[in-house]
Design a protein with these regions (language model features):
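A short glycine-rich, hydrophobically flanked beta-strand micro-motif that places a catalytic Asp/Glu
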Residues: 47, 174, 185, 241-253
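ATP-grasp fold ATP-binding core
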Residues: 102-103, 127-148, 168-181, 185
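Conserved N-proximal alpha/beta basic substrate-recognition cap immediately N-terminal to
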Residues: 11-116, 120
Length: 291
């Protein structure tokens, strides 16, 4: 093992940090500082720098999201560059791929269906829904960049107008998921380390759009944190991401289902501890590659 490694750190473009620019910047900085404190040399790049072939380091940690940048990460990974997170993992966290992979590998999630609005009448109701069912409509083709990329629909009779809004914004593929009752919890984890953190977002101010309020105040339903962590680590393995976070619903019987899963979120309530764990994981992955 070397005394130090030269590592590229690529930050996230602001458009992919809706209401979270400072928080995303803070976790990126925390990781950088923990790596430098261990003697490693980190050169910082912007997301767009990936498109100009100026990044020459063999090891990269990154928070990128754009299609072009993720595609470049995948190209570099095929050439032997080691990445946290992998460009292929970031792509898997786009909602359509994630929904299909969770179904394929039996990761608990709401009943969901992918709708192609280009070929489907906006008045057609997905067959997973009854006329009384509340649901969520979420853009399928990428990461959320604005509040109306994720829409709660209280009555399925309103689906048509919601679909039309997506089509007007040139978003032709959406995931429609049943609305789940229960306590909503938010979690952060780092694969390959003991680090795992969860909390009730409605009890804090750590929320992008405030959508957690739809489920109301948590009842404190008893559930197994070990089971939650096991589900999340399995999801991270399936999606091929090392740094992750997301949201889950705990039903009255303690059943846990994942409703959102993200590559490298903000870790806002646990930034320093999360940053330390991420830095640890980066070095572990590099050292494994060096053996």
């Amino acid at each position: 093992m070397k005394d130090f490694y030269r590592i590229a750190g690529i930050s996230r473009a602001p458009i992919y940090s809706p209401n979270s620019i400072d928080k995303d910047g803070a976790i990126f900085l925390a990781v950088l500082q923990h790596l430098e404190a261990k003697g490693h040399q980190v050169k910082v790049y912007q997301e767009d720098d990936l498109l100009h072939d100026i990044i020459k380091e063999k090891y990269i940690f990154n928070m990128v999201r754009s299609y072009e940048a993720v595609s470049k990460l995948q190209e570099l990974e095929k050439q032997g560059v080691v990445e946290v997170n992998s460009g292929f993992g970031i792509e898997n966290c786009r909602r359509e791929q994630m929904t299909r992979l969770f179904h394929q590998y039996h990761i608990p999630q709401p009943e969901s269906v992918v709708c192609n609005l280009e070929y489907k009448s906006t008045g057609v109701k997905p067959n997973i829904l009854s006329s009384e069912t509340s649901c969520w409509v979420k853009r399928a083709d990428g990461h959320t960049t604005q509040v109306n990329d994720v829409v709660f629909v209280s009555e399925t009779s309103k689906l048509g107008e919601v679909f039309e809004d997506f089509v007007e914004r040139s978003i032709n593929r959406v995931v429609v998921s049943e609305h789940l009752q229960g306590d909503i919890i938010k979690f952060y984890g780092v694969a390959g380390t003991p680090f795992f953190y969860w909390f009730y977002p409605s009890m804090t101010h750590h929320s992008k759009f405030g959508l957690e309020e739809i489920n109301g105040k948590p009842k404190g339903i008893t559930f197994s944190v070990d089971q939650l962590q096991a589900i999340c680590n399995k999801a991270a393995e399936v999606l091929v991401v090392d740094v992750y976070g997301g949201d889950a619903i705990v039903a009255l019987d303690g059943t846990i289902r994942i409703i959102d899963f993200n590559d490298w979120p903000s870790f806002a309530p646990c930034c320093q501890d999360g940053g330390k764990a991420i830095a640890q994981a980066i070095i572990q992955i590099i050292e494994k590659e060096e053996i």
